[in-house]
């Protein structure tokens, strides 16, 4: 069964709320096989990036999976060193060639960077106008980055992909994005695996016959957040997709919300944005 529950972006494009994240999947057999498992398990949203160096693997899986292209939602991202107007256009062409696609569904600026994201966004707007991408967005942008972008853009970002999990619930940023009609996607939605044995999450899962991982993904989706768990394990990929047959209660959500500690497993965009 296709996992097609979707969220409508500000431009009307439908984006599946569950995606398959490809971070850290080795290019070649590992990434291609895992992506194929995900698609066969019903995933219709694939999330890769230039820096992951596995766009070609994603492309091979997409080409051979038997699912029509228009039924898949493919995201890739521009790396920091390619920011700037002309270099963005060039980098996009490299990505789309590696993917073997005529268009991507969502293209993201991976990190804010130092001082080029305005010019970079103008290139994104051109790609969008030229229908090479169906939606454009950002990743790891804080409120002040988005405010700066909104001062200069013709087309507002449709998505902001950020680190988000129970120890970093990003409530304020999520509320801000919602106020600007920007959808939020969670990367590292399971806290890079550190939270799958958490007793609080396991106790909640026990009520539904679900794992802590499934509870976290369900919590994100019920909060209106798109989530992209990564795994190279076929059983885990299937498990992560099996989250649409139960619903967390308000009390469950209160417990998970209460776990927030402002703890990042990934870099802080305020620091990493200068690291090219």
From Swiss-Prot:
Please provide the record's keywords in A-Z order. Answer: Cytoplasm, Fatty acid biosynthesis, Fatty acid metabolism, Lipid biosynthesis, Lipid metabolism, NADP, Nucleotide-binding, Oxidoreductase, Prostaglandin biosynthesis, Prostaglandin metabolism
Could you tell me one molecular function GO term of this UniProt entry?
nucleotide binding
Got a GO cellular component term for this one? cytoplasm
Q: Where is this site: Lowers pKa of active site Tyr?
A: 77
Q: Which Pfam families match?
A: Aldo_ket_red
Q: What is this protein called?
A: 9,11-endoperoxide prostaglandin H2 reductase
Q: Name the species this protein comes from.
A: Trypanosoma brucei brucei
Q: What is its EC number?
A: 1.1.1.-
Specify the pathway: Lipid metabolism; prostaglandin biosynthesis
One GO BP: D-arabinose catabolic process
Main location as per UniProt: cytoplasm
Active site positions, chain numbering: 52
pH behavior is given as: Optimum pH is 6-9.
Q: Where in the cell is it found?
A: Cytoplasm
Q: Does the keyword Magnesium apply?
A: no
Q: Which residues cross the membrane?
A: none
Q: Which residues bind substrate?
A: 110
Purpose of the protein: Catalyzes the NADP-dependent formation of prostaglandin F2-alpha from prostaglandin H2. Also has aldo/ketoreductase activity towards the synthetic substrates 9,10-phenanthrenequinone and p-nitrobenzaldehyde.
Q: Which family does it belong to?
A: Belongs to the aldo/keto reductase family.
Which reaction(s) does the protein catalyse, per the Swiss-Prot or TrEMBL entry? Answer: prostaglandin F2alpha + NADP(+) = prostaglandin H2 + NADPH + H(+)
Q: What InterPro entries would the database entry show?
A: AKR (IPR020471), AKR5A (IPR044499), Aldo/ket_reductase_CS (IPR018170), NADP_OxRdtase_dom (IPR023210), NADP_OxRdtase_dom_sf (IPR036812)
Q: Which residues bind NADP(+)?
A: 22-23, 47, 139-140, 161, 187-192, 230-232, 236-240
Q: Which CDD domains match?
A: AKR_AKR5A1_2 (cd19156)
Subunit text = Monomer.
């Amino acid at each position: 069964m296709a996992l097609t529950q979707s969220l409508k972006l500000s431009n009307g494009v439908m984006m599946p709320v569950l995606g398959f994240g490809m971070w850290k999947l080795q290019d070649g057999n590992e990434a291609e096989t895992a992506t194929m498992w995900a698609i066969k398990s019903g995933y219709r949203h694939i999330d890769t990036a230039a820096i992951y160096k596995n766009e070609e693997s994603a492309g091979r899986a997409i080409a051979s999976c038997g699912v029509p292209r228009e039924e898949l939602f493919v995201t890739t991202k521009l790396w920091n060193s390619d920011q700037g107007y002309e270099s963005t256009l060039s980098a996009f062409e490299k990505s789309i060639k590696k993917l073997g696609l005529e268009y991507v569904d969502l293209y993201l600026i991976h990190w804010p960077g130092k001082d080029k994201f305005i010019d970079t966004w103008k290139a994104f707007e051109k790609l969008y106008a030229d229908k090479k991408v169906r939606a454009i967005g950002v990743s790891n942008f804080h409120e002040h980055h988005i405010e700066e972008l909104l001062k200069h853009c013709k087309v507002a970002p449709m998505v902001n992909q950020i680190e988000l999990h129970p120890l970093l619930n990003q409530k304020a940023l999520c509320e801000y994005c919602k106020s600007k009609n920007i959808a939020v996607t969670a990367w590292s939605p399971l806290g890079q695996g550190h939270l799958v044995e958490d007793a609080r999450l396991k106790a909640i899962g026990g009520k539904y016959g679900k794992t802590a991982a499934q509870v976290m993904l369900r919590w994100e989706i019920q909060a209106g957040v798109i989530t992209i768990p990564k795994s190279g394990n076929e059983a885990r990929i299937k498990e992560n997709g099996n989250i649409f047959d139960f619903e967390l209660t308000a009390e469950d959500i209160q417990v998970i919300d209460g776990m927030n500690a402002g703890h990042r497993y990934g870099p802080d965009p305020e620091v990493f944005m200068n690291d090219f």
